[in-house]
Amino acid sequence: MDRSQKADAVAELNSVFNEAGVVVVTRNLGLTVAASTELRGKMREAGASYKVAKNRLAKLALKDTDYEGIGEMLTGPIALGYSADPVAAAKAAVDFAKSNDRLEIVGGSMGGQMLDEAGVKALASMPSLDELRGTIVGLINAPATKIAQVVTAPANKLARVFGAYGASEAA
């Protein structure tokens, strides 16, 4: 890799760090190519990305970003999982690590907040932004639905009474 390629790699990683909502650092020592490909696929399905990066270049790219603190974690064979959704990358990495003991979660960062392995696992157990939005919409919609049911209930009961009365007269 020549100097210009390294500069491009640093610039690309820097833009990744500036746009990411969360970065998860994993140690992938002994992870097979097939397992790594499977992990990339799971990350992609979750709306996240997974990238193996040279430690020195990643440390250079971390400068002047919210994730500067994770530079200490970049030792040995590492890879970075990242996503705009603060939960997606953590959830995909933790789920994959449960089934594959070769992947070790080192830690991560959410904005300026540093996370250790337990912090990443706790983050992975939280609902995603889409799930939270769905819950909020449901909570907002519930009172309106109940009001509509209460308003239409007397008319429905009256219609049933008339229907039953008409059926009994016909019989």
Curated annotation (Swiss-Prot):
InterPro entries: Ribosomal_uL10, Ribosomal_uL10-like_sf, Ribosomal_uL10_bac, Ribosomal_uL10_bac_type, Ribosomal_uL10_CS_bac
Gene Ontology CC entries for this record: large ribosomal subunit
Keywords annotated in UniProt: Ribonucleoprotein, Ribosomal protein, RNA-binding, rRNA-binding
The gene coding this protein: rplJ
Physiological role: Forms part of the ribosomal stalk, playing a central role in the interaction of the ribosome with GTP-bound translation factors.
Ribonucleoprotein among keywords: yes
GO MF annotation terms: large ribosomal subunit rRNA binding; structural constituent of ribosome
Family: Belongs to the universal ribosomal protein uL10 family.
The name this protein goes by in its record: Large ribosomal subunit protein uL10
Disulfide linkage: none
This protein's record includes keyword NAD: no
